[in-house]
UniProtKB/Swiss-Prot annotation:
Annotated GO MF terms: calmodulin binding; DNA-binding transcription activator activity, RNA polymerase II-specific; RNA polymerase II cis-regulatory region sequence-specific DNA binding
Protein name: Sex-determining region Y protein
Nucleotide-binding in keyword set: no
Entry comment on modification after translation: Acetylation of Lys-130 contributes to its nuclear localization and enhances its interaction with KPNB1. Deacetylated by HDAC3.
Free-text function comment from the UniProt entry: Transcriptional regulator that controls a genetic switch in male development. It is necessary and sufficient for initiating male sex determination by directing the development of supporting cell precursors (pre-Sertoli cells) as Sertoli rather than granulosa cells. Involved in different aspects of gene regulation including promoter activation or repression. Binds to the DNA consensus sequence 5'-[AT]AACAA[AT]-3'. SRY HMG box recognizes DNA by partial intercalation in the minor groove and promotes DNA bending. Also involved in pre-mRNA splicing.
Species of the source: Equus caballus
Gene: SRY
One matching Pfam family: HMG_box
One CC-aspect GO term: cytoplasm
A biological process from GO: cell differentiation
Family designation: Belongs to the SRY family.
The protein's assembly and partners: Interacts with CALM, EP300, HDAC3, KPNB1, ZNF208 isoform KRAB-O, PARP1, SLC9A3R2 and WT1. The interaction with EP300 modulates its DNA-binding activity. The interaction with KPNB1 is sensitive to dissociation by Ran in the GTP-bound form. Interaction with PARP1 impaired its DNA-binding activity.
DNA-binding region range list: 54-122
Length: 223
């Protein structure tokens, strides 16, 4: 049961528990002042820090739709609440300024009463929880090589290396321990490239098609 502080003007006259659609309990607190009958709502999950949540005063449209919503719901029981709101919105727009005037005056009167009862009231809209954004970028399947080059080719074994670049670097798996052994630039890298080509039948699968061993060797020596 919610705790309500004792006051000279207000006291807890009754408390009624209801269950909301989301499964949370809601307490309806009514004051002893027969002239106000103001209803405040508290959530059972403690989000309001145990304090009563003061509802905003009704505007002109809410005052007008208070009775019309009930009428439309009785005439069309199959309609959802959102559809009823759309119909009421269209009907409200079709009214003339003279027809809307009494409801604006009533809304102004309710706003003045609300401000008199709750002078420190400030509207605090509830913020929606932000969902974490999922990244659509796929994870790299091959080891990343930080090299200065223009083209990247992939051999039949799946190991990438660079052609037409200043450095020839390649990551290979050791057959004994499985550790990655980097090759230095220059002649050592060219020798490693030749061994790779001979082991893979001197063919490579490139982005533009198959490139033979002689073509790769000619490009390497031209640097």
């Amino acid at each position: 049961m919610s705790r309500v502080s004792n006051s000279d003007n207000y006291s807890l006259a009754g408390q009624q528990h209801t269950v909301l659609g989301s499964g949370r309990t809601s307490s309806l607190l009514w004051t002893s002042n027969p002239g106000s009958h103001f209803r405040s709502e508290t959530r059972g999950n403690g989000r309001e820090n145990g304090q009563d949540r003061v509802k905003r005063p009704m505007n002109a449209f809410m005052v007008w739709s208070r009775d019309h919503r009930r009428k439309v719901a009785l005439e069309n029981p199959q309609l959802q609440n959102s559809e009823i709101s759309k119909r009421l919105g269209c009907q409200w727009k079709m009214l003339t300024e003279a027809e809307k005037l009494p409801f604006f005056e009533e809304a102004q009167r309710l706003r003045a009463m609300h401000q008199e009862k709750y002078p420190d009231y400030k509207y605090r809209p509830r913020r929606k929880a932000k969902m974490p954004q999922k990244s659509d970028k796929p994870l790299p399947q091959t080891p990343l090589l930080h090299c200065a080059g223009r083209r990247t080719y992939t051999s039949t074994s799946g190991c990438p290396f660079l052609i037409h670049g200043r450095l020839f670097l390649r990551a290979t798996q050791s057959q004994t321990g499985g550790a990655v052994k980097p090759f230095a630039a220059g002649a050592t890298a060219i020798s490693a490239l030749q061994q790779e080509l001979s082991q893979q039948h001197r063919t490579l699968r490139c982005h533009s098609g198959n490139v033979g061993y002689a073509d790769i060797r000619r490009r390497s020596l031209s640097l």
